[in-house]
Regions:
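Intrinsically disordered, low-complexity terminal regions enriched in Ser/Thr/Pro/Gly
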Residues: 1-162
Length: 162
């Protein structure tokens, strides 16, 4: 019985820690490959080509779950914005016109989960000038209403002339 009690106490402490810490984006990483939770190949650097596609690994933590009979519902919303080195927002129609399925996760799981990740393939505009940019990734926990955002730096290289 002591092990069961210890397990319950540990779960309670973990829940309290999650609530105290609050909803956050634990990781946001530029990648070359993403296989599963915390199993990805980080990009060697931040260099990308105009018109290329960036692959992002995003790991939110301390998200809320809504209980529905014996299921738990995870509901997260995503938004991406591109900023240049002067912090001016640039329009990226492909990101703004992303489908609801690409901008939202609503998952039904058997038990409470604390680990979750999402990957995004974001096409860059072909007309980007060479220079430093930031991708602002915003994740909102629809259950708690809490939002966190991170900036992922990228450097757009020159287009090779042929």
């Amino acid at each position: 019985g002591d092990h069961k009690e210890a397990g319950k106490l540990l779960a309670l402490f973990n829940d309290e820690d999650r609530l105290a810490t609050g909803f956050v984006i634990e990781r946001a990483q530029l990648c070359t490959a993403i296989r599963r939770f915390r199993d990805y190949t980080p990009a060697e650097g931040d260099r990308v080509k105009p018109g290329g596609v960036i692959l992002l690994y995003v790991e939110p933590r301390n998200f809320g779950l809504q209980r529905n009979q014996d299921k738990h519902i995870l509901h997260l919303k995503y938004e991406w914005k591109l900023y240049d080195d002067r912090s001016t927002e640039l329009q990226v129609p492909a990101w703004e016109q992303a489908s609801l399925e690409e901008r939202e996760d609503r998952l039904s799981v058997n038990g409470p989960v604390t680990e979750f990740y999402q990957s995004f393939k974001l096409p860059l505009p072909a007309n980007l000038a060479m220079g430093h940019y930031r991708v602002k990734v915003t994740v909102t926990d629809a259950h708690s209403g809490k939002t966190d955002r991170v900036h992922v730096p990228i450097y757009v290289t020159a287009v090779e002339k042929r």
